[in-house]
Amino acid sequence: MNRIFGRKKKDKDSDEKGSTESENDFLSSLPAKANKRYSMAYSSLQPDGNNSTNSKSADKFDDKGKAVDTPEFFVNTINLLPNIEILAQLCSSLQSKPSAWSKSLIDCNGIEALLNVLAFIERNGQKDSDVILQSLAVTCLLSLLNSKYGIEKAIATPNSMIRLITSMDTPKADTRSSVFEILTAICMISEKGYQLILEAMTHFKQVRKERFRFTFLVESMKKVMNSSDKEYLTTCLTLVNGIVNSSEEIDERIQLRTEFTRLGLDEVISVNKNIPYEEAPDLLTQIDVYEDEQRADQEELSERFEDLDIDINDPQVIFNEIYKQAKDRLHHPLLAILQSLLSISSDTEVGMLSWFLIEKLVLQISVNKPMIGDDDGKVSLEDLLASTAPSVALQSEFQKNIEELAKVKDQLKKANFDLNIANQELSSRSHESSVLKSNMFNTVKQKDQEIIKLRGQMKRIDSNFFSPPGGDGDDHINVINTPEESSPHHESPRKQQQQTSKPPLNPKSSKPPISSSQLKEKSKSNLSSSSSDSLSNDFKSQVEVAQQQQPQQQNIESTLTPEPTQIIKEEPIVTTPPPAPPAPPPPPMMGGGPPPPPPPPMMGGGGPPPPPPPPMMGGGPPPPPPMGGKGGPPPPPGGGGFGLFNSNKPPANAPKFTVSKPTTKVKQFQWTKIPNKKLGETIFTNLGTIKTDWLNVGEIENLFFAPEANSQKKLEASDKKSTSSTKPGTVSVIDPKKSQNLAIYLSKFKCPLEEIKTALYTLDEDIFTMESLKALEQYLPTDEDMEAIKDYLKKDGELKMLTKAEHFLLEMDSVSSLAERVKSFYLKILFPDKLKEIKPDLELFTKTIKDIKNSKNFLKVMEVVLIIGNFLNGGTARGDCFGFKLDALLKLADTKTANNKSNLLVYIISELEQKFPDSLKFMDDLSGVQECVKISMNTISADLNLLKKDLDAVNNGIGKMKRSKEESYFFSTMDDFIKDANIEIKIAFDQFQEAEKNFQELAVLFGEESKIPSEEFFVTINRFIVMFDKCYKDFQRDKEAAERAIKRDEAKAKKAQQLKRMNGKIASSTNNKNPLASSSTSVGDGGMVEDIMQSVRDGDAFKQRRRLKGTKENTDDSSSITTISEQSENSNTSSITITTPSGIELDITPSKSGSRREKKTSKSSDKDKEKEKEKEKQCESTESEDINKKDINVAAKALTIVMRSKQTMHSRIDTFNFDA
């Protein structure tokens, strides 16, 4: 690094004469305020005759004028009034004064004073005028820190790295570059300084309110990554390498590299990776260092898991391996960890910081560090959270507040919910009261109308009543009573049981016939009592079941309608035959007006029974014929008759029980009924007669009622309907799960069910796809489905009330040979697609076999392996080999070199490239092998056989189907398909047999068994190709890196020669002019930062650190730096040997000019050396004379240059020429 603000020494005589004048000129040129403070600082340093320090000052300095040039003067002035003039003069002094002067400035807290200037600028807000002041302060620090002593003092200064890193935020790129150089040197020299830099980066992130600590660094690189000037980019990437590679822990290095990758560093590298080496050699060197170190860390990390044989870069593979290890004993801890990770959000700032914190914790644990931090200072979790972000430290308290607020919110929500429920309940009860009031008046009105109708009916019965001889009336009454006895709708279960358990009637036990007058009187008395009793009881019933909201007319009809459920079978009633046939009952109505309603049931159970209800259109059983004599007239047509019921008649051993219907609408229990014809095989036949008197009907209705939200208008409209309002909108009688799945399946069709049915006849592929046909096979109607639907329809069920699923099953059931049609249709669609999958595989398989057989390049590779292998195995049992199996190719990488840095595969690649370059094209010749790995001949054979089997089954199924003219299109289409499919399947079988034959020949050709699985054979070749390709790319990369290393070393040797010649000139001139400064121009081990930066730029520093890693853990910090410096000095050698990361050693010969120069130097005679020395002395004397001629006032010149730099803010201040 060139010295900046260099100040040239004056002659001794001129210096003595002009010291006072220069001092006075300097002070007079300053502003009044500044002049006063300078005078104060100067007066405090004036020698005093009575002071004992006068002699020391006189010994140290030539005269009292030099007091303004003392370290104390500069430190006091900078602390009192930092300004551009004083810092410019300090820069000049640091370049011209001896190392003892610089050390004295450091001891006077000069570094802290300069850092305070940076802090002052940052604290007061950076202004335009502060840019130059900041640049000068950083330049002075760069000079003071150019030694180990200065760096140690800076590290010991509190908050030094924070104040230094804060100065990165400046518009001047040169200032940032100087800061980056200082930080890089500290990272490489001191472990403590390295940790302070990372902490300062975190603080800088918080000040700028950025999410990541390296955001500013990477973003500044992105801004210039496409520019032609690569110097700044090189300095930044040098700092990145210093930060990443200075850690001794591989896990921390990987973590830091991951942070930079997240911020987009890889993008910057990729943009500048392929530029010509001559344009930016140092930048390309840094890129190589970054990638080489990254690759080395990955290899070192892979060694940890080499026994697992997994890809450590695949998260899914790693998770599967972790789960495999932890699933037995560590299942619960792993599950708890995963559940906790799942609850952490990645969208918020706290969530992101939590993830990074977890990553850091796991890394610390993985390297056996149970505590966070080093042994000297353990960090608690709270402190670590606080260092990660201030907001995270308050997260615990914040979370408690959130939980408390959440509880209050839940309580408020619960109170609002209860309030809404109370309001709804109040509104509902108000509505119920209005409905009850309305129903009460309607009921009273309805009962009055019923009384009038019943009185009219009594009159009709009275006028039509007659008493035939022999007790015909009694026979008629028995006929009337039969339906009532079989309809226990309004009787208790116990009473029903008692009625059904009564013995059958016989002639001896039958009651005497009732006379006409007795029946009339009894009817009148019962009518009056039943009317009043039923009116009051029905009104009470209406109040109790107000939520039912049913029309009264339907309640009466349900009272009269017999229960369709199973009724205990009674023995036929036998009575004495009457002397004359009775009159037939009134004929039933065929859909005319409704019959006159019967009187309501009486509480006591007495009174005459109601007349039988008219048969519905669904076809109920006719009333039983009169006892004795011939039966009554047959049921009217359309009634259905007994045949339909006998088809689903329960077996004799079916369980017997009686259950009444609910009086309100209740929720249904979704079960699947066992068909009656299969009931005899179940355990239900063992139940016998079941008692139901324990059934609490009212409790069940109250618990499972289904409330309706119908309006009053809808209720009034429902009064006019003859159907029961307890029925839901739709009815499903099949398995609920199947009904739901079928509804989902049918929703995919955008056409009516009739079109779906027609598509099965017309083979319409616009409606049916392969997937829908495959699913249809699962939803074909079964016997149970159709039996359930038919049972519903036979029991007066309405077809339109069934769901779409039942309608679909009915449509499908009407299709002839449904299963065969669906299977044929499915195969017709599947067959071409399946062949399209098989044929290309067979063609690729056959082509790849031919490529392997005909590849001369692959044969050459096998030949080279055979020759080298025979040489290595010569004289052993493995020698004299004339052929080897393919798996030997996978073992090439296992044969390591003597230094274990390379292997036999790398050597073979190098031999092939040098001697048989065309053979490297074998990977292109065998490009189809990668796809053949996925092809299994066994799978293809199974698929072809399955297609053939399905085709034969479809052919046989269609042959058994009845052909009709209406289905001519279906049969003709399927006949053509079967004919073409047989031809195609035969061609496919021929191709398969040919491919199988060729593969067997290929397997034998490579020494394998003919029955080896094809996928195993091609996997071996493919693994070799992948391994060869990766190794070849690494070899190419190493070769390019070696070529760049040659150019770099040539440039390094040339620079070393120039530097050596320049140092000789400067040393000679300095010794002649000022013996005090002959030792060094900086502190002690001066030039350390320069040497380190040069070594870092050349890439030698990182190689040396990796080479010494783990071998010198307790050595001094400067040991590696000393080695680096020694290596940089001895870098000029006649030949260079470079070992690539792959282990190949390359001998590098310098360029002709360099070798010629070295050769000339080594063979030069003593006379030539003397002549060269004389020439150098002449050059030095000439330069010193020029310097003396150009001697000027440095402080005034610095001020002038600074003023100019304000106009060009982005010019480097260390490139200013004071001698201009």
UniProtKB/Swiss-Prot annotation:
FH2 domain mapped to chain residues: 656-1054
Q: Where is the composition biased (Basic residues)?
A: 1-10
User: Low complexity: which segments have biased composition?
Assistant: 501-518, 525-554, 1117-1142
Which terms under GO biological process does the entry name?
Answer: 'de novo' actin filament nucleation; actin filament polymerization; positive phototaxis
What segments bear the compositional bias annotation Pro residues?
A: 575-638
* Residues annotated as domain FH1: 532-655
* Entry annotated with the keyword Transmembrane helix: no
* SMART domains noted in UniProt: Drf_FH3, Drf_GBD, FH2
Q: Which domain of life is it from?
A: Eukaryota
| GO molecular function per UniProt | actin filament binding; profilin binding; small GTPase binding
**Which keywords does this chain's UniProt record carry?**
Actin-binding, Coiled coil
The entry assigns this protein to a family as follows:
Belongs to the formin homology family. Diaphanous subfamily.
Role, per record: Formins play an important role in the nucleation of actin and the formation of linear actin filaments.
Record's protein name: Formin-F
Q: Which organism is it from?
A: Dictyostelium discoideum
**Name of the encoding gene:** forF
